[in-house]
């Protein structure tokens, strides 16, 4: 049976990758203090493409290495490799082609530092997290979350090359936001899917330490997140428009985290999971709008 374009598309986890590359795009915009030059637009577009292809390759490799686990979980049992729509060698070739194209674009037309950081992130997620951390520790998503948090830095690097310490610091603050956001985001899902994780012998926190402990950890990380999101204002990267938007988003996220301690029903954790996605997209949208369209409110 021939492999369809949709099957290859599904291998890339398009919804997950869309959020990843959006934060990379915001990193690009924040890195440029004024209107971008034509060269910056061209470099940014190529950087965006390279980062997107690398993230897609990482997603495909993750599905290749996790096929046995995915087959045991209701949430992932439909994936193309699990149901036999694609063969493992086809996934490997597909991912390899994406990596080669991505690295060629980044090295030749963007810059080496972006290529190196992007490749390191790919290895961090597709290999270190998927092969080792996911199966080894209940802190898998905390430690492994660093690889998934780097896209804003990758975007920043694409248009600047990270030439100064200020560039590294500002880009790192954006990475820190996603890094702290990842545990409450993923643990909310893990609470709802804990039976699947237990069946697949994946030591997610709700499986190893119980749901009440996980709910408390979600609250702790959500409080930390609310604090960390003040950093762009503290360093002068963003202004009052972003601060106001972040305050509203954080208030709702904190309410969800507090309510999670005694949720009204089993589905509440999925509601928090859904909001966490909206939260991150909106937070980075506020960063971008504040930077591009509302300089007068700073």
Curated annotation (Swiss-Prot):
Enzyme's top EC category: transferase
Pathway connected to this protein: Porphyrin-containing compound metabolism; heme O biosynthesis; heme O from protoheme: step 1/1
Alphabetized PROSITE patterns for the sequence: UBIA
Subcellular location per the Swiss-Prot or TrEMBL entry: Cell inner membrane
Listed InterPro entries: Protohaem_IX_farnesylTrfase (IPR006369), UbiA_prenyltransferase (IPR000537), UbiA_prenylTrfase_CS (IPR030470), UbiA_sf (IPR044878)
Membrane topology of the entry: Multi-pass membrane protein
Transmembrane residue ranges: 16-36, 45-65, 93-113, 114-134, 141-161, 172-192, 218-238, 241-261, 277-297
GO cellular component, one term: plasma membrane
GO MF annotation: an example: protoheme IX farnesyltransferase activity
Gene3D superfamilies named among the record's database cross-references: UbiA prenyltransferase (1.10.357.140)
Entry-linked Pfam families: UbiA
Record GO biological process: heme O biosynthetic process
EC nos: 2.5.1.141
Domain of life: Bacteria
Record key words, sorted: Cell inner membrane, Cell membrane, Heme biosynthesis, Membrane, Transferase, Transmembrane, Transmembrane helix
Main location (coarse class): membrane
PANTHER family: 4-HYDROXYBENZOATE SOLANESYLTRANSFERASE, PROTOHEME IX FARNESYLTRANSFERASE, MITOCHONDRIAL
Note, other: Carbon 2 of the heme B porphyrin ring is defined according to the Fischer nomenclature.
Family designation: Belongs to the UbiA prenyltransferase family. Protoheme IX farnesyltransferase subfamily.
Function: Converts heme B (protoheme IX) to heme O by substitution of the vinyl group on carbon 2 of heme B porphyrin ring with a hydroxyethyl farnesyl side group.
Name assigned to this protein: Protoheme IX farnesyltransferase
Organism: Xanthomonas axonopodis pv. citri (strain 306)
Name of the gene: cyoE
